[in-house]
Amino acid sequence: MPCSLETRSPQGLSANIQDLAFHGSIAVQPLALTASSLVTCLGAGREANASALRTRRTGLAPCAFETVTLDTCVGEVRGVDDVRVPDRLRNFDCRNNRMAQLGLEIDGFSNAVIAARDRYGPGRIGVFLGTSTSGILETELGYRKRDAEGRLPPDFHYRETHNTYSLADYVRHAFELSGPAVVVSAACASSAKVFGSAARAIAVGLCDAAVVGGVDSLCLTALYGFHSLGLLSPHPCRPFDAARDGISISEGAGFVLLEKPQHAASPARVHLLGVG
């Protein structure tokens, strides 16, 4: 999990934000989070999510996703099917990349990345994203349309949808970036680990800024897989309740833009001080 790390001088005084923090064995400068976006079942945008948390409103509801007939609650993001990817990226069209597009468009995040691209150059911005199942739903849907020989339909594009890397590939094409692009798929730790990957890349000079975050979308594999393990709750999950009885599967997207503080267009209120 990401965690802050405060550095101190030999005299015990707190160091300022420009002092070094440590990531593994690499000393790096703290990185500024200059833009961010968030889409969950609570709503689209940071404010919608904050409002739901303040009013204790849940986004979990009885599952009505696709053909699923499980007695469980899910956190489905409304409106994903209405999102349209750019025409030039139509081969990437799948629920996971539409979820990504929704996250890129909200909270002014897209404008911030474009401004950074203009400032640093497209080859100096990296993309470091986490996902667990990527666009596997597209394969699940395509499987229903196999021909007599078992072939998937001709409009199915594995590389741009189901392939785990398709998420980073979609985002880099969406912003026309040519810096390093990485996807980490390590279950629930995926979106935490990419902060470390981005910090390392900036520290060693591979890029000057990075789009960092994660996207996951509902799919039959995750729902039926966790059901087969007996882990799904029939109610909205209550992880800290003595009577807790399982988990609830959800979906969403979250992005941040990481930059060195001295190069950011404006001062940031939040900084990444370390990962461990």
Feature map (PLM): residue ranges:
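Conserved active-site "lid/cap" helical segment
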Residues: H23-I26, L42, E47-L129, G135-E138
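Condensing-enzyme catalytic core mediating Claisen C-C bond formation in acyl metabolism
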Residues: P30-T34, R46, A52-V74, P236-G276
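A glycine- and small-aliphatic-rich helix-loop capping segment at beta-alpha/alpha-beta transitions
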Residues: E47-S51, E140-L152, V171, A201-V204, ...
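Active-site nucleophile and cofactor-binding loops and adjacent substrate-binding regions
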Residues: T67, M99-G103, H157-Y165, V182-S190, ...
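Active-site-proximal alpha-helical scaffold in enzymes
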Residues: S110, T164-A168, R172-G214, I249-S266
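Active-site-proximal gating segment of KS-fold condensing enzymes and close homologs
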Residues: T131-V182
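Acyl-CoA/ACP chain-elongation machinery
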Residues: L206-S228, S233-R244, V275
